[in-house]
């Protein structure tokens, strides 16, 4: 599971995801990518499940790049605990994903396999996505 090795602070505010992605909206490595169309917090488990689905469909050919990293801690209190008494412990790690953000990139496989793999991966995510292709010469 992805998570930071160390952080400046143990716990974070909930925060908001406003507007379009300020960076990471172009393909940097592969020929095909999976682009987010909605704002959402994506957990480390969802990222890993997506990576596995994509890799399995590609039959371990080609290369996969994960372009998001879960660096925000989400806290939760134990079950049946009364309100108050401080903030709960870190429960999971999430990545804040804004619309337009490239989540995954792949290369080294034919277009039909790439689109199928990314579609299977997209089914593991809680947001609407679309498959994008690199345009040469721009």
UniProtKB/Swiss-Prot annotation:
Alphabetically sorted, this entry's keywords are: Ribonucleoprotein, Ribosomal protein, RNA-binding, rRNA-binding, tRNA-binding
Q: Which GO terms describe its biological process?
A: translation
Molecular function terms in GO for this entry?
Answer: rRNA binding; structural constituent of ribosome; tRNA binding
Specify the superkingdom. Answer: Bacteria
Q: Which NCBIfam families match?
A: rplP_bact
Record's function text? Binds 23S rRNA and is also seen to make contacts with the A and possibly P site tRNAs.
* Name of the protein in question: Large ribosomal subunit protein uL16
Organism whose genome encodes this protein: Hyphomonas neptunium (strain ATCC 15444)
Its taxonomic placement starts with: Bacteria, Pseudomonadati, Pseudomonadota, Alphaproteobacteria, Hyphomonadales
